[in-house]
Amino acid sequence: MLVSDPRSRRIPKIVGTNNGTFTGFSHMRVLTTAPDEVRELLAHWTEGSSLVVVALCAAWCDTCNEFRASFERIAEARPDILFVWLDIEDDSDVCGDIDVENFPTLAIYRGDALLHFGISLPQQSTVARLVDEMASRSAGGSAAPDAVVSLPRTLRRHFA
């Protein structure tokens, strides 16, 4: 799982959890290794005005691997927004029953309200425009499976 920190421009990579104990890290800049800090970042999600962008991808997906650098650049350019990268297999304990038909799939929330759920072109400019559009929305209205709608609560429970 990758979580950006809206308080800074650095992005941590958290790989594999075992009941909240982190088991490894990637080559990326690591901001936090403490579960309390991850919980604090996820608490940011509950603030009604906070925008959260979740990329649902897979490590084996070449498109996802190419898209990841673009996703990180968008996160660095928008420190006011929380960005979360979930690997649907490595983070299956969090993703649960979310059915991803193609990659990358994005879920964008304002607080717990889902604004957008769908496949995106893996282009930085396309995703940046989508994020900007969703940032200007004040309320949700995207239809999606229950597992997607409840993802904010699932993540918070996972790190509780």
Regions of interest found by a model, annotated:
Residues 65-76:
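Typically the conserved alpha-helix immediately C-terminal to a functionally engaged Cys/Sec
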Residues 47-59:
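Short active-site neighborhood of thiol/selenol oxidoreductases, capturing the structured segment around
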